[in-house]
Amino acid sequence: MRAYERLLNYVKVYTTSDPVSDTHPTTARQFDLARMLVKELQDLGLADAHVDEHCYVYATLPATPGHEAAKGLGFIAHMDTSPDAPGENVKPQIHENYDGGDVVLPGTGAVLSTRQFPFLAKLKGQTLITTDGTTLLGADDKAGVAEIMTMLEILQKENRPHGKICVGFTPDEEVGQGADLFDVEHFGAAYAYTVDGDEAGEISYENFNAAAAFVTVHGFSVHPGSAKNAMKNAQNIAIEFHNALPYYDRPE
């Protein structure tokens, strides 16, 4: 099966995560795709494929003879889609032999403009897959899942030599919890790639890393008639705190 054929199957499975949920996974529906992938992995010969109670899928493709000593190489992608737009009843649109111009999404009339997305011009002549505009497509990151699954199929069909291949599919990446309960030791890879990126052929060898904090600032209210050198404005204190943060360490 081609990678795009798998993608078309996967995007029809509703897997939107929930940023306000306190469960792991944040939505039980993510198990629907997880179980589908476990079955497909087992059919591809990865006999140990399984999904744990928190919706993490793990599987291993053993090394081919003569390559058992190679360090395990991992490939990771996430199954959930962003809650910022609808993720149910996805209707993929296939644009064959794309002409390099603006793309109109038929469900809403929204336009994917080459002015806003200049990289589209590089894709002239290729086949594009988009949403109809009423939902997300879900290629983030079901395209990554499809690519990993297709790689596993090709490695075996073409008898390509390889070391141990470790596969991990995670829930809840879109709400910042994808790695929270990922079992690195159980995964078993010495090195790993996350297949979730930008243009074809691009590799990011480092990533932005940050933590979040909730800061509460308490002011001190004094009658304006006697406030000089006594009143404390919480907003101004918060501004001072914000400006004290290292400028070049901020995401922007």
Task: Identify the role of each PLM range.
Residues 117-120, 126-139, 172-252:
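Midchain, well-structured core segments that form catalytic/ion-binding scaffolds
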Residues 33, 140-147, 234-237:
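Catalytic-loop motifs flanking and including active-site residues across diverse enzymes
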Residues 19, 48, 161-164, 246-252:
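Flexible, glycine/charged-enriched surface loops at secondary-structure junctions
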Residues 2-28, 129-130:
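N-terminal capping segment at the start of a domain
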Residues 22-70, 74-76, 80:
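A non-catalytic alpha/beta surface segment that caps or lines the substrate-entry region
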Residues 6-9, 36, 40-44, 153-154, ...:
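Generic non-transmembrane alpha-helical segments
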Residues 67-164, 169:
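Active-site metal-coordination/substrate-binding segment of hydrolases
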